[in-house]
């Protein structure tokens, strides 16, 4: 048993709190929402900053339309989110108004955070909102998402946001009370695990499927979020969102839920951003010489080393670099689009301008914007 210490406002000032759909839906959903607003207000009164990541647009849309099952088609889900998101924000605004706290809606897509410039713009906006004393409420922009580049669920989004704003702690409020030794639905004797030092393969195996009709994130998703947070050195609390004072109790050191240690920060800056990117859609295959130079570290990828370009991508997007055997070398940001690279592959840098009519840079991928696969594990 690991004794948990208090997480004070002095050491854990900036928090990201994610609320799951299952907590906000159902007959008790509004009561849970009001209780969470009260807890956030109490955190603010302690001098902490809070960014809220709220699921529930589709679940709220289901309630408004009287549906019992979520549509299976992507357009149906997007329309449902469009119906539910305004009401979800109104409910949050009303809940926080009891404590004279103002809120701001921030809708993001995976594509927003996959572009470095937009990523930094999002950070600046959130920093400004926090400086103004406003509670940012973030959700994935479901109405414009596409399956190939969506976050997957708000557990993953919350981990990215925690990294984006440099949070001291990530809190996931869920209908899942804690990480258990085994699935408590099929193993009633299973005990909750109060503390996890590191999310490894053994811990991931503890995750069972926990589907529900309104949400998308089960235990595996929460463990993957914890893994992302650990890479940034951010501790993560998994707490029961239906328990009125679960945040306060956990921050005081009570064995509520599961605390995942932050550990040593493995990445920072651009490398951390590359590690947390959604799966890149494009690929470039490089020759043996380029593969060796990239793997040894410190080298940029030049067009001459590119043998093949796969997929569609634009300037500044992330692509996977593969060797001729199909092994992943790493992930980097391209200085040319897929169409441009297809024209200048296997060519010398001095030929770029003649082939394209212009030259952005000599490098297809600069070494400062490339992370080896071994760094991303």
From Swiss-Prot:
Lineage: Bacteria, Thermotogati, Deinococcota, Deinococci, Thermales
GO molecular function list: ATP binding; glutamate 5-kinase activity; RNA binding
InterPro entries noted in UniProt: AceGlu_kinase-like_sf (IPR036393), Asp/Glu/Uridylate_kinase (IPR001048), G5K_ProB (IPR041739), Glu/AcGlu_kinase (IPR001057), Glu_5kinase (IPR011529), Glu_5kinase/COase_Synthase (IPR005715), Glutamate_5-kinase_CS (IPR019797), PUA (IPR002478)
Family matches, as CDD domains: AAK_G5K_ProB, PUA_G5K
Annotated residues for binding of substrate: 55, 142, 154
Cited NCBIfam families: proB
Binding site for ATP: 18, 174-175, 216-222
Pathway membership: Amino-acid biosynthesis; L-proline biosynthesis; L-glutamate 5-semialdehyde from L-glutamate: step 1/2
Function, in words: Catalyzes the transfer of a phosphate group to glutamate to form L-glutamate 5-phosphate.
The UniProt record lists the keyword Cytoplasm: yes
Organism domain of life: Bacteria
Entry's Gene Ontology cellular component terms: cytosol
Residue ranges occupied by any PUA domain in the UniProt entry: 281-359
Organism of derivation: Meiothermus ruber
SUPFAM superfamilies: Carbamate kinase-like, PUA domain-like
Record-given protein name: Glutamate 5-kinase
Main location, first listed in the record: cytoplasm
Annotated compartments: Cytoplasm
Annotated family: Belongs to the glutamate 5-kinase family.
Catalytic activity field: L-glutamate + ATP = L-glutamyl 5-phosphate + ADP
């Amino acid at each position: 048993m690991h004794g948990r210490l208090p997480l004070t406002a002095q050491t854990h000032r900036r928090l990201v709190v994610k609320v799951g759909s299952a907590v906000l839906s159902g007959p008790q959903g509004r009561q849970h929402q009001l209780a969470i607003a009260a807890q956030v207000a109490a955190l603010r009164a302690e001098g902490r900053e809070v960014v809220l990541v709220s699921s529930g647009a589709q679940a709220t849309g289901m309630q408004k339309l009287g549906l019992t099952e979520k549509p299976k088609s992507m357009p149906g889900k997007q329309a449902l989110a469009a119906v539910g998101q305004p009401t979800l924000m109104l409910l949050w605004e009303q809940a926080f108004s009891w404590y004279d706290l103002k809120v701001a809606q921030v809708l993001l897509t995976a594509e927003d955070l996959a572009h470095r410039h937009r990523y930094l713009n999002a950070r600046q906006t959130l920093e400004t909102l926090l400086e103004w004393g406003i509670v940012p409420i973030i959700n994935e922009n479901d109405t414009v998402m596409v399956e190939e580049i969506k976050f997957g669920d708000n557990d993953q989004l919350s981990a990215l946001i925690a990294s984006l704003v440099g949070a001291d702690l990530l809190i996931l409020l869920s209908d899942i009370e804690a990480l258990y030794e085994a699935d408590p639905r099929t193993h009633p004797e299973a005990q909750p695990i109060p503390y996890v030092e590191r999310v490894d393969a053994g811990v991931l195996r503890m995750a069972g499927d926990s589907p529900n009709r309104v949400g998308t994130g089960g235990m595996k998703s929460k463990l993957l979020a914890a893994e992302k947070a650990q890479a940034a050195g951010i501790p993560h609390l998994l707490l029961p969102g239906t328990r009125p004072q679960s945040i306060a109790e956990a921050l005081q050191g009570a064995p509520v839920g599961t605390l995942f240690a932050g550990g040593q920060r493995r990445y920072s800056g651009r490398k951390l951003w590359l590690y947390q990117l959604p799966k890149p859609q494009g690929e470039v295959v490089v020759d043996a010489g380029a593969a060796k130079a990239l793997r040894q570290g410190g080298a940029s990828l030049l067009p001459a080393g590119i043998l093949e370009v796969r997929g569609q991508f634009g300037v500044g997007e992330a692509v996977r670099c593969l060797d001729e055997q199909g092994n992943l070398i790493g992930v980097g940001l391209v200085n040319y689009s897929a169409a441009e690279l297809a024209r200048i592959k296997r060519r010398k840098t001095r030929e770029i301008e003649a082939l394209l009519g212009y030259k952005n840079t000599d490098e297809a991928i600069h070494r400062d914007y490339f992370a080896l696969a071994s760094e991303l594990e």
